Amino acid sequence: MSETLTPSAGAANNVVGRVTQVRGPVVDVQFEGDLPFILNALHVQNGDHTLVLEVAQEIGERQVRCIAMDTTDGLVRGTEVRDTGKQIMVPVGPATLGRILNVVGEPIDERGPISSELRFPIHRPAPSFEEQAAASEILVTGIKVVDLLCPYLKGGKIGLFGGAGVGKTVIIQELINNIAKAHGGVSVFAGVGERTREGNDLYFEMQDAGVIKIAEDGSTEGSKVALVYGQMNEPPGARSRVALTGLSLAEYFRDEEGQDVLFFVDNIFRFTQAGSEVSALLGRIPSAVGYQPTLATEMGALQERITSTKKGSITSVQAVYVPADDLTDPAPAATFAHLDATTVLNRSIAEMGIYPAVDPLDSTSRSLDPKIVGEEHYQVARQVQQTLQTYKGLQDIIAILGMDELSEDDKKIVGRARRIQRFLSQPFHVAEVFTGAPGKLVSLEDTIRSFKAVVAGEYDHLPEGAFYMVGDIDEAIAKAEKMKQEA
């Protein structure tokens, strides 16, 4: 590809400017000659490290306004700035596997430089219509509620929506555990504006799981995941670009090696939030709820690159923070339009102690179609949702009049729905250290078989507690037996 450059190609040209103003992460630079292009990377020496600036605006004939990719502490007016003549270029390829990179592609895992001659720009065009390929193969996650009610597609875009503390990151980590370990290809994880502690935990968990392999000599050969971090403490410039850096890494494996890539993003809302901060600093007039006026454009530019082509695929799982649990907020609303499957986490379900706290009636998937999942799966999923919806409709009557006022049929439906609700819970491998309960991975066949029997009323005689935090129906039966003996 013409844009795959070696470090020596397109070396820094001689266009030199000087810093005229520093306002937090926004830096104004004056040039005497030609101005650098928009999105060009500029280098400025700040103490003992090179600070990367990205050109965002031209202000007047001689000045450009830039966004800093790292802290500007210590930067003074008059400092010399060099135009690199190209965008921010990041190393790509097998050498990035097992490593942690920052937004500009520098290693931050203290394991020495990345020995890759291949580099990609972080801003790249989306694949054309001719290059794209439709996906219709189901990606089995081993999580019952997901596989049954909002199944994921290989090569699809998946969103995990939820407010603060309802379990988005835990589900992402469980998906990495269940899918990435069994996945033949490579994975890329972009940590966008989230907690540094979580990034640290994930790195060591991946080593324990064997997805990242570090030899005694420090080599990471045999690793299957690359990590790109721009965490909460980073300036908004880094947080608004780190998802693009991760995506460039994933695109290399898709386009150049023809691989099926898993791309995890935690959290896509922070990408929007950082864009909002940058927009305000650049003096743009804000739009609804204070977000940037270019919200839909920026989201589209990112999401349209995440797609399957005839060469390979990118399956993306994106956590989406929902401010104040309001799904109509412009940031989550802008993300909805791009997704193939949405898994919505509900605080009221989490408060009942049912984890994963997935809302079975709010979560949707384009692939819950008899042509894709098959007639049996489709019918079982719809019957489960119908039972839960009927129960939801009866809850007001139960709250006012009590269970005794219901008809016998309604009482059966309520009992069945409560069993289904509890059966949708599942112990996770990544939560094992906190709960002490071993994680369960349930096959799609077992999930369909189990729910088909429960929704048909075959297990109405078992106590509700037997369905809580188990794998398939056989475990629920065994738990019921144990409860009977202990009673």
From Swiss-Prot:
Reactions listed under catalytic activity: ATP + H2O + 4 H(+)(in) = ADP + phosphate + 5 H(+)(out)
Record's keyword annotation contains Membrane: yes
Cellular compartments annotated: Cell inner membrane
Membrane-protein topology: Peripheral membrane protein
Listed Gene3D superfamilies: 2.40.10.170, Bovine Mitochondrial F1-atpase, Atp Synthase Beta Chain, Chain D, domain 3, P-loop containing nucleotide triphosphate hydrolases
GO molecular function per UniProt: ATP binding; ATP hydrolysis activity; proton-transporting ATP synthase activity, rotational mechanism
Keyword hit for Phosphoprotein: no
Keyword terms, alphabetized: ATP synthesis, ATP-binding, Cell inner membrane, Cell membrane, CF(1), Hydrogen ion transport, Ion transport, Membrane, Nucleotide-binding, Translocase, Transport
SMART domains for the chain: AAA
Enzyme Commission number: 7.1.2.2
CDD domains, A to Z: ATP-synt_F1_beta_C (cd18110), ATP-synt_F1_beta_N (cd18115), F1-ATPase_beta_CD (cd01133)
Annotated NCBIfam families: atpD
Subunit comment: F-type ATPases have 2 components, CF(1) - the catalytic core - and CF(0) - the membrane proton channel. CF(1) has five subunits: alpha(3), beta(3), gamma(1), delta(1), epsilon(1). CF(0) has three main subunits: a(1), b(2) and c(9-12). The alpha and beta chains form an alternating ring which encloses part of the gamma chain. CF(1) is attached to CF(0) by a central stalk formed by the gamma and epsilon chains, while a peripheral stalk is formed by the delta and b chains.
Family label: Belongs to the ATPase alpha/beta chains family.
Protein known as: ATP synthase subunit beta 1
Gene label: atpD1
